[in-house]
Amino acid sequence: LTDGVFDSSWSLFRDRLTWLRETLTEIKKINNSNWLIKPHPNDEVNRVITSTVSEVDKICRNCNHIQLFPNDIAIGSVPKFIDAAVTIQGSAGTEYPCFGIPTFITAETTISGLGYTIEPQSKEDYFSQLQNIKKIKKLNNQQIELAKIYFFIYYKLMDIPVNLIAYMESSIIDEKRFWTLMTKLLNKYDFREDLLIKMMKIQAKNNDMH
């Protein structure tokens, strides 16, 4: 609910909480399909006022066809037993299409318009497609190939080092060490050698989305 909140220029929903609540309310009525709800790890890290777990409990209590994702199941096994995925703009839209799994996105993402995600144009369209989710077919070979190509580009080729920012895992930040490294980088920084700046100039010149 708190990850990448301001990343999109458009969304079918006002915010992530609205998307979650309205989606849960809709799938509550779609009991011919089983729904697994996976909370985002940031819910616990950021100690949010309301969470995915509490919203599911409040809206979908006693709905046997809606369950929280079990903690004892490896995330890597998910593609083996799901038929579709739904996200507002999360990494599911990048990952699951690589396995041929049709995936809904309801806000702008870096994969918007690439041809392998389901992108409803309105809330009504979104809810209608959820109601008919059993009729949605697996992705074809061309779509799967496109998804894999993008995945490789995004996670491998786009990983450009930034000469001015010290690398540190966001989950274990040592602020004193971070600022010490930042000071050292700043003292020897030369923007003419910065690969990121060179790449951004090319992107701006070509008016590229990525």
Predicted regions located by residue number:
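Generic, well-ordered alpha-helical scaffold segments in large soluble proteins
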Residues: 22, 26-30, 59, 81, ...
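Flexible loop/turn segments at secondary-structure boundaries
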Residues: 1-6, 42-47, 75-78, 93-95, ...
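Short acidic-hydrophobic, aromatic-tinged amphipathic segments that line or gate anion-handling sites
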Residues: 66-70, 117-129
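Nucleotide-activated donor-binding/catalytic signature segment of Leloir-type glycosyltransferases, i.e.
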Residues: 53-69
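Conserved catalytic-core segment of nucleotide-activated headgroup transferases in glycan assembly
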Residues: 1-57
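A donor-sugar binding/catalytic signature common to diverse glycosyltransferases
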Residues: 71-118
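C-terminal amphipathic helix plus adjacent low-complexity
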Residues: 124-210
